[in-house]
Amino acid sequence: VNNKVAQDTFTPGWLRSVGQGWIVWGLESFIDEVAVKANKDPVDFRLAMLDGKGKQGGKAPESVGGATRLANTLEILKKKTANVKLGADEGIGYSVSAGQERTMPAWLATAAHVHVNKRTGKITVKKLWVVSDAGIVIHPDGAMAQLEGSLLWGLSLALFEHNEVKNGQVSKTNLHTYLPLRMNDVPEMDIELVESEEFPVGLGEPGVIGVAPAIGNAVYQAI
């Protein structure tokens, strides 16, 4: 998905997960909208498209299995969230992300459980899940730390960090007004690394990009 419109509007700087941060947000939100219009379950709707055929097939050595590996992470995630009991004004949203066109791809499925206060509009994330296939995990503790940090950064970007441009410059210039995620906003997290014997790939960035669309899709379900 090309981000030409964004490039024509402003010049983005460096950020963990770079351009994919907003591309996947738009793409995965749109897929949920299509699923709703088609009266399909959003997870099953995605799984039906992830058949690993054609361009989805992957290539040796770094992306053997292609989209079938992404489908596997989503299947695992579906089972993890199957028995979650939702309260009033709560929802669970899903997203998937993969870097299959890059030389260091990873396949991830993300879910978010949210509560929406319909009176105030406040969104509370109660739990985040992520299932990741990054091939052989060389350093499990390091991989887990990467994904924990990714989920928290993604949550911070989605709900907390915001900076308006006024008169040609950003309006918030220090941390007393630019507020990132705080410790008391950290939700429960469930992270699973898929056991694999395939080529090991990077986990530094892909965990960030699935959080915002999962939250957005959960909010839609909640309201």
Task: Please give the residue ranges for each predicted region.
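C-terminal catalytic domains of large/alpha subunits in multi-subunit enzymes
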Residues: 1-103, 109-111, 115-223
